[in-house]
Amino acid sequence: MTQLQEARKGIITPEMVQAAELEGITGEELRQKIAIGEAVLPCNINHQGLRPMAVGKGLSTKVNANIGTSDAYPELAPELSKLEIAVAAGVHSIMDLSTGGDIDEIRRRIIQDSPVMVGTVPLYQVMVDTHKAGRGLVEMTDDEIFAGIEKHCRDGADFITVHCGVTLEVIQELREQGRVMDIVSRGGSFITAWMLHHQRQNPLFEQYDRLLNIALHYDVTLSLGDGLRPGCLADATDGPQIKELITLGSLVKRAQEAGVQVMVEGPGHVPLHQIETNMQLAKTLCHNAPFYVLGPLVTDVAPGYDHITSAIGGAIAASSGADFLCYVTPAEHLGLPTEEDVKEGVIAARIAAHAADLVKGIKGAWEWDLEMAKARKALDWPKQIQLSIDPEKAGRMRKAKNEDSQERCTMCGKFCAYQLISDYMGTPFKGC
């Protein structure tokens, strides 16, 4: 049985117990959230050594890091290094988006080495394999699509992105309304090209029950991809995006009725004043299923700094209902991320997630900040470094800027606020 089926039968699984402990809640509380579809617990029966984590309403905001090869950079070793760096930086999930090299070997090694849940986009590999076979990208068959999906599930992917909501009707809406950037989702563009070439409905939509049967067998969580997500602010919250979201809402119910865990993916590029509306729409139209957002990026003009534009949007999105943030690295829109880009992306997204958890009242979030405040008041530098979201960087910067014997730090020097106020408040001053 899947975690959803177990939850509906009143069974608290060992995975639920482990995930609940990380949240500071009981297994029964988590079971109830999973049973009604407001939380998912992605844990493929074939992913050995997984540390189960739940995603959903009332739980801490989770962060995903995308890694994976490209045709230009097909080597496995750098991606395993990125996995290690992301996990060390506190990521909760990894997605392997590989399109270069030995994709099967890369995916299997990432799943084998990852202690956190792993997601994939099977359609990417189907497209690559079709191209390698000397055929046009639109010449992949229905059977090849579903065989590719089953292979990823069999290998242990805990969740898979599937672009089931990109239908002929949604594409007609796009044609009628128009957009600045049309379709920026790789999976969405592949499916659209396939449908227009064959003049047929999306097989992932048309044969959705076939997909559900595969997911049910391996207890794979479906992540319903947003193929019409906006790729720029000008396209945000438009007709094609919302029409697809309505379609995804109906697919959420069908998955849950079949006993399959399901979450929904969201935008994208969204201006600040539209983010809360987008989160409310998604939660309402998709029956409070967990919502997984890329960013959202709040401006289009900051290549090289999109980990910042994403963190701004992510904090607002998560505080408004999003449950899962996909990181964005400084390399977004520019090229494949390096190991350092991966770490920066994870930390930026974790900052956004934590800022939102403070608003949502997640257990332990407020206490973390309070402990930092107390450490600062006490001028306890080792404690401050320990409590930092990135202790390595904080410690390195502290050491580079200050001598161990200094009474004050180099920011304020003899004008230290702590020393000044201690003279009048009677608080002992230890020095920095």
Curated annotation (Swiss-Prot):
As its record notes, the protein acts as a catalyst of: 5-amino-1-(5-phospho-beta-D-ribosyl)imidazole + S-adenosyl-L-methionine = 4-amino-2-methyl-5-(phosphooxymethyl)pyrimidine + CO + 5'-deoxyadenosine + formate + L-methionine + 3 H(+)
Q: How is the cofactor bound?
A: Binds 1 [4Fe-4S] cluster per subunit. The cluster is coordinated with 3 cysteines and an exchangeable S-adenosyl-L-methionine.
Q: Which positions bind [4Fe-4S] cluster?
A: 409, 412, 416
Q: What class of enzyme is it?
A: lyase
Enzyme Commission number(s): 4.1.99.17
GO cellular component labels: cytosol
Give the GO biological process terms.
thiamine biosynthetic process; thiamine diphosphate biosynthetic process
Keywords tagged on the record: 4Fe-4S, Iron, Iron-sulfur, Lyase, Metal-binding, S-adenosyl-L-methionine, Thiamine biosynthesis, Zinc
| Residues involved in Zn(2+) binding | 269, 333
Its biological purpose is as follows: Catalyzes the synthesis of the hydroxymethylpyrimidine phosphate (HMP-P) moiety of thiamine from aminoimidazole ribotide (AIR) in a radical S-adenosyl-L-methionine (SAM)-dependent reaction.
The UniProt entry's sequence similarity note says:
Belongs to the ThiC family.
| Protein known as | Phosphomethylpyrimidine synthase
